[in-house]
Amino acid sequence: MEETRTFSTRDATNVHTSFRKAGNRMSAWAALLAAGLLEVGWALGLKYSDGLTRFWPTAATVIAIALSFGLMALALRSLPFGTAYAVWTGIGAVGSILVGMLLYSEPTDPFRIVCLALIVAGMVGLKLNSPV
């Protein structure tokens, strides 16, 4: 005889919890992406601050650093430390190099492009292998 099972409030709680956890993971990765982009911003701000001697670029740099660190801290609540840190610095490195190529005519030779692609591939691999 086939047993019928009813949907209980406990089942609803479990479904809600799993969706909330998925949302936290997505939020953590979004926070990490934003933190990495802000890292590019504060690195660029350092260039424009002229050795921290110009007020507004320096202020913008300090704000970007604080926001980047704050978002990284939020991401670390859910993501593994090593993965999060590697992705954060990778976004900053790749973004900074791309900004240098686009804004400051830094070299765009094929070897540099391959190296950037390897950094991105490493970050994607870490993300795909992350338990969260």
Predicted regions mapped to residue ranges:
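Polytopic alpha-helical membrane proteins, predominantly small-molecule transporters/carriers
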Residues: 2-132
